């Protein structure tokens, strides 16, 4: 049976209508329970999503190490607690765009998560834009001192701008990639579109917006409930038609906010998706600035 998929093409009215294709790899939009081999290997290499496991006997000899040595041993993903779905999201985001040394990238709401440091180690010039505890929604501690410390520890050069994207004064048409890993569902509706506007502004023509957004199974459109303690289900599929953004590839039936979104298909195939302790799925998509 053929999948319904979406691949990048010129716009003609609304561009979220699915069509059949037998050509090329189909990129699914919702994080899957079963990881591709390269994702498993990536997580093992970088200690994602929660840091490297303790080494043999570390419970005893680890107490002799300094805090810095223990942190370095645990790796960049040990700093900030992550959802289980990140085991899919982080390698997916890394492989979504082939990185080359010198590429300028932005990590929106990167906090102290390890992904920004992996991007830097891969040769990218990384700017993390995060207001930390000053965020209006769900914030976390993220300050210049901590980022400088982690840069020294991991041999990276991440730049932190402790503010929102609207206050970051990013150069227009200057960045190759903007990453947003599970951030947009935690902001207000106004902030969502304000952020999308600034992402579009700072990207080069042909630049990519790599985004993952939580899809809560206990909220609209699956139930009548509008919000939970973590956020809301934003119709992220509407980004496909925002300004000159275009969806690169994927199955639009799995993206909330597209006309093809199929909640029944999702609910009847829950065993295929990556689920943590909380009833949430991860939507993964790549947009290109045309």
Model-derived features with residue positions:
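Class I (Rossmann-like) S-adenosyl-L-methionine-dependent methyltransferase catalytic domain
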Residues: 3-96, 105-106, 112-167, 210-290
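Phosphate-coordination loops involved in phosphoryl transfer and adenosine-cofactor binding
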Residues: 101-102
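A short acidic, Gly/Pro-enriched loop at the edge of an enzyme's catalytic core
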Residues: 166-178
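A short SAM/SAH-binding and catalytic strip from SAM-dependent methyltransferases
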Residues: 177-190
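Alpha-helical membrane segments in multi-pass integral membrane proteins
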Residues: 177-178, 199-200, 209-211
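A short secondary-structure junction signal
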Residues: 190-192, 222-223
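A short glycine-rich, Lys/Arg-flanked "PGG" loop and its adjoining helix->strand segment in the class I
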Residues: 193-205
């Amino acid at each position: 049976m053929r999948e319904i998929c979406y691949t990048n093409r010129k716009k003609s009215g609304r561009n979220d209508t699915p069509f059949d294709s037998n050509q090329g790899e189909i990129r699914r939009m919702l994080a899957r329970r079963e990881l591709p081999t390269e994702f498993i290997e990536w997580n093992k290499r970088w200690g994602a999503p929660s840091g490297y496991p303790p080494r043999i006997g570390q419970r005893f000899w680890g107490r002799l190490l300094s805090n810095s040595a223990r942190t370095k041993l645990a790796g960049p993903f040990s700093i900030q607690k992550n959802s289980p779905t990140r085991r899919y999201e982080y390698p997916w985001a890394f492989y979504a765009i082939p990185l080359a040394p010198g590429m300028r990238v932005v990590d929106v709401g990167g906090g102290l998560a390890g992904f920004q440091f992996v991007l830097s180690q891969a040769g990218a010039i990384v700017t993390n834009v995060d207001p930390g505890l000053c965020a209006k929604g769900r914030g976390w501690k993220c300050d210049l001192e901590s980022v400088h410390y982690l840069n020294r520890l991991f041999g990276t050069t991440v730049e932190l701008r402790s503010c929102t994207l609207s206050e970051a004064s990013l150069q227009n048409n200057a960045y190759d990639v903007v990453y947003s890993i599970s951030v947009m569902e935690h902001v207000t509706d106004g902030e969502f579109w304000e952020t999308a506007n600034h992402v579009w502004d700072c990207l080069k023509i042909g630049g990519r917006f790599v985004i993952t957004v939580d899809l809560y199974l206990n909220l609209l459109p699956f139930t009548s409930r509008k919000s939970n303690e973590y956020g809301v289900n934003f119709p992220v599929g509407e980004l496909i038609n925002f300004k000159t953004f275009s969806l690169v590839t994927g199955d639009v039936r799995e993206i909330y906010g597209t006309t093809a979104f199929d909640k029944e298909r999702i609910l009847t195939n829950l065993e295929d998706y990556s689920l943590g302790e909380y009833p949430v799925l991860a939507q993964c998509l790549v947009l290109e600035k045309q």
